[in-house]
Amino acid sequence: MALEIDAKNATAATGDAGGATGGKAKAKENKTNNNNNAAGEKNLVNGSSSSSAAAAAKKKGKKNRNKSPPQQDAIEAEAGAALSNGHAVNGVGDGDADAADANANVLADKPDKATAAAEEKSATPDDEAAAAVAAGDDADLDALNDIGITVNISSPGTDVLSVQLSSMELVQEIHQLLMDREETCHRTCFSLQLDNVTLDNFAELKTIEPLEQGSTIRVVEEPYTMREARIHVRHVRDLLKNLDPADAYNGIDCTSLTYLNTITQGDLLDKKRTRPDSVDCTPPDYVTPGVREPPLLPLHPNIKNAKGPQALKVLTTSAWNPPPGPRKLHGDLMYLYVVTMEDKRFHISACSKGFYINQSTDDNFNPKPDNPSHLSHSLIDLLSHISPSFRRAFQAIQKRRTMRHAFERVATPYQVYQWSAPQLEHTVDAIRAEDAFSSKLGYEEHIPGQTRDWNEELQTTRELPRKTLPERLLRERAIFKVHGDFVTAATRGAMAVIDGNVLAINPGEDAKMQMFIWNNIFFSLGFDVRDHYKELGGDHAAFVAPRYDLHGVRVYNAVDVEGLYTLGTVVIDYRGYRVTAQSIIPGILEREQEQSVVYGSIDFGKTVLSHPKYLELLRLAGKHLKILPHSVLNERDEPVELCSSVECKGIIGNDGRHYILDLLRTFPPDVNFLKLEDVQMSKDLSEMGFPIEHRHKLCCLRQELLEAFIEDRYVTFIRIAAAHLQRLNAKKQADKDLPEEQSTEKPTEQSAEKDPMEKEQDKEKEKDKEAKPNTSSTETKSAEAMVNAIREAQSNVAVSNEVQAAEVVKRACATVGSLKEKEFDFRFNPDVFSPGIRHIDGPDGGGQSLAKQKRLVQDAAEFLVLKQIPAFIKEHTAHSSPPIDGQSLTESLHSHGINVRYLGKVIKMLGQMPRMDYLHRIAILELIVRATKHIYYTYMQSTEPLHLSAAISHFLNCLLTTGPVNPAVSSEEVHKKQLRNNGGKHNKHNKSSKSQAKPQSSSSSSSSAAASTQNGGNNHNSNNSTAAAAGAASSSSASNNSSADWTLVTPRSLWQQIRKETKAYWNFELDCDSVETAGAKYGFLRISLLRAFCLKVGIQVLLREYNFESKHKPTFGDDDIVNVFPVVKHISPRATDAYNFYTTGQAKIQQGLLKEGYELISEALNLLNNVFGAMHQENGSCLRMLARLSYLLGDAGDALAIQQRAVIMSERVNGIDHPSTILEYTHLSLYSFANGHVGMSLKLLYRARYLLVLICGEDHPEVALIDSNISLILHALGEYELSLRFIEHALKLNRKYFGDKAMHVAVSYHLMARTQSCMGDFRSALSNEKETYSIYKSQMGEKHEKTRESAECLRLLTHEAVALQRKMNDIYSNGKLTSDLPPIHITPPSMGSVLEMLNTINGILFVHISQKDIVKVRSEIEKHLKTNTDENEITDALKTIVAAANNNENATETTKDEGAAAAGAAPGAGETPVQLTNGGGEETTATATATVSS
């Protein structure tokens, strides 16, 4: 199975560097060379060959071999190579997919919105794919499908291999296939020949004329070059350390961990069904209910056996390198040094023909071949010849490598870091050393032109054509690849900058003001060095500005306007510093600042420029982003039109492209956190303490909030217009007999008089609507009434009442606050509250009225507090997909448009709701972690590199313990440092001496100014923490002693700072002064706090058990800090067509068409594989949905196979303890049980429960679900006492979170009764079953099937209990038995009944339905669809009325754009990329054959 590859791998395999858009470190690419194709060994989902879009590639390789930067055709070639992925089985994708957004919020598109989202896609740039799906037009898909061809491959020393390939694959794919197979994996330098003609690596198979079914392709060994020899040695090293997890722990080469196969002890699909009596089901102690603090060691199981056998002691380059002149002329390329496991030492020569042992020793150089000489083309063959131990070990490594699941061997798209790691052995590794010191990015200097032109690559990929599906796949694949490489390079560069390994471009300036260029990427540390942010919050504003800028880049990229370009942007937090990495605009370093900017302002609005081309491009983007074009006055009092915020700068690069940067104010300001004189808060907000003065003035509203706000206003607009029209029609009917003049005047006057009252009524109605949810029948009636009213109005409009219709729309617009009088128009002016900007105020009531624009921004901020926060809390009261940690809570808040700065308000609301106790606890923990992060960043900036581990361990001791926290630095040393006056100079980024900048050269000065422009002239990529609340040293005077400041921190002082920070930033009063009181009051575990904090700031601690209660010695020592890693934020490229297929598939599922839905989602997965490769978060979401559908369709085996892949993928791309991983484990356990793997099912549940308790403790609704599952399976295995412990805990949690009369509680009582009856405790069983019966009766009525089942159960239990009691009484009265005691009838439940109950617990209910039921369900669906259609008709009708009204008044403006704006108000209308599914939630699948309960 050949897998899609990129041209980086092509270079590694063949030396043909053509067509590459670039590559990651070759260490990674060679590692993946032997891993790539494995990903395709198993059919991903449905056996259909995944489509390839390599048609556009053609033979680009040789043409572009020497081009740098790569041009468009080169990128097409790379993308083409990457996309090609078909054998007979489904090609899963690229093992070297280089980037993904780890922060990508995989949001749940609610199933009932799926259809709407799919329909609304027609308003987006992606309409083509959605329309193709909807219309059933498969032309694009047909273009991707191709025929298979079977060829034979003959390699030296192995049997002929027969493989089936796609005719659209490149020859390069066969190289990758051979480098992955066990028998040929050690070959790297070879060519492929057909009829003695060498095949072009970048030719498609279908273009090779002699190639036909059954042709034999020969593998021919080629002579080595210096580069090929180095690649071969690196490949051998990667093969030997293939099983070693060290790279995954060190965060290298996109390797990551997975423990599924460790837990299941092999592939689940290979296991036989187990008999219940043969299962070892005893849970580990740390999994049983009541555990106080879960241990840390089980997080990484079976570490000791992970490494695999050692084949060599040393493999390194020799110190005799490079070969001297005479030896070069004899063909010597390089020398290697090897120590075998037998302790024999060899010096090896690499020449053009291969490898041989020479006669050199450590002291004498003798390059002649050893006697007897043995020349091997492969280094593996030579080492096997000289060392029997190597031969045995290599065979064992290969065997274990091929036994691993394909997904374990594929590189992840993005580096996942571990927050804990074992003590790793540091071995001799010359290649690792070379990567660290010799080269800029591994082997990237081997790409033509050496360093890559990142900006050219990023922009060229965006310019690729996108008209057809194959073109779009090529384009998105290329964008994803280049973006991933850029993120990797930016991350390495940022770490190098902070570690002091990069020279500044302005070395003479103060360290805080320095900027850097490395590998064609511009880096800036963030401090407010030139007082750009003095009025906006100084360093605090400078710290958050890069993050807001990144949000702006994300949304403009999502809109994807042709001709408008953004910079590649990555924000990296590392060692307490924030670094922003950006691609460089061509020519920016050659020009002065003032010459560069042609649009926007470089001084916050004092001087403002505009440009017609920018206005045109930004107006297009603004329609999607709801940005209002507005005019401001420049320094000469001339009006200047803008279609963005004034800070947004436009620069035309030397390449002629129009770039925008500094997008930090893309969205309107949040007035709830700004103290403004001209803003009057509403009474509700004033009572809640708003406005709160934030520490910076860059607070913006989120795009999700604006969409929700516009949608809410649009619904109100429709309702008001319909009510007016209905009343108008009724009045007209009543006034038929009156003269015409009166009849037209009266309604208008009366309506005008009623308007204020109607507004009040509308408000009351909305409040009522929030207080109690409407039933579906009421909604249907009101929808029908609205439709009828508008239909009548339409017919009346057509006759003579255009004026009245216009009046109706006008009133509705006025009521909801539309910017235009006669159209629904909601757009926002991002500059409306910006200080120092002089706006041109339009006439009152018009769209340019400043008062109206301000009111709109205020209303949106008020909507957030009064509507969105309550809606967020209400949504979580059902506990259907509850957040598990701070990250999932943050994602959920963001999906509702709620910024994290509102966390204090959210916590206060949650604190009043006992049923939301778990969410309150998670929110408090997140609050503490974020406050501590602010303090930690300043703390780290004032720490010498020499004392980093001591400082971090001291900080963790202060945060997590109350015992002794003596810092591991002598008091003498501290005293010396405090005496020094220049103590602040130890860390070059913390220097803040007052005017010590030395005179610098003019070239340095000009490059610095130009770089400042590249950064928008603001140097906003700032890196000073918000930790001033801690009172830590951040001023120049304080920096003198700052190097020793960390030693002065104590647990008491740190927690005081945390309390101050939570009050200052979130306006929330923490009621604790130590970790002990905090844990006791709020109920979180210290291990959970440790995990959350390490992940938040990038600390890796040693994997061992920590005693947080220790009173005699510090919990953390220097050696417990293993590493610090970067926390990286960047955008996530989209797969638009895959998303459209996915949403259409969801819509089909909602209609009960499971098979059609399955096929569409399978196709979505194929497209995702094409764009992202085999490993990506969204692929995992697709797999989970497909597994669930397979299960619902009755194919439990297929569900197990797919879900196993979903688990491995989640562990590798999200993390081994990520909330999504826990969800995947619970799903897999259900499918394992359904396939008869009872023991495995329990092990998977134990793992899920352990991870859940580690993250958030036992008090969580998800723990109740897992405990119910464990209890039921233990019950089936006859472990009644264990089962009872778990179900009692589940019952306790269910009662707490769902209430005493909830269905969850009824099920828990029933399970307890079943278990107790099996134990012979009929009295308790009877009592519990009575509770079940009582709940069923009150909730569903006496005649419901569940109530009747419970009644029957009660009858049987009563009978057994009475019989037993009678015999017991007999014994007590007579002292002996008068008759034989009959045995207690305990019949263990059948596996079928247990599975049925498991399905019920997990929300899956299979319903056997008749034809009559099908008809009934179909009519319900049609009614639901009719309601949706009615809503669309309302929209269309209103547009008609507005158009008629405008025509009547000779209006010149069309309503098309405004109508589109209104229609696009709903989420999913195309403004933002909506990801596939909720990473941490349950998909609901309500269909005619299967329903999912809450």
Swiss-Prot record:
Its family? Answer: Belongs to the CLU family.
Q: What is this protein called?
A: Protein clueless
Q: Name one GO cellular component term.
A: cytosol
One annotated GO molecular function? ribosome binding
Q: Please note every region of biased composition (Low complexity).
A: 32-56, 993-1044, 1460-1472, 1483-1494
Annotated transmembrane regions: none
In this chain, the stretch annotated as Disordered covers 1-79, 272-295, 733-783, 969-1044, 1450-1494
Q: Which example biological process does GO assign this protein?
A: ribosome localization
Q: Where do the TPR repeat units fall?
A: 1138-1171, 1264-1297, 1299-1332
Against InterPro entries, the record matches this protein to: CLU-central, CLU_dom, CLU_N, CLU_prot, GSKIP_dom, GSKIP_dom_sf, TPR-like_helical_dom_sf
Identify residues that carry Phosphoserine. S278
Location of the protein in the cell: Cytoplasm
Gene designation per UniProt = clu
Specify the taxonomic lineage. Eukaryota, Metazoa, Ecdysozoa, Arthropoda, Hexapoda
The segment(s) forming the Clu domain are 432-674
Keyword entries, A-Z: Cytoplasm, Phosphoprotein, Repeat, TPR repeat
Basic residues composition-biased segments: 57-66, 977-992
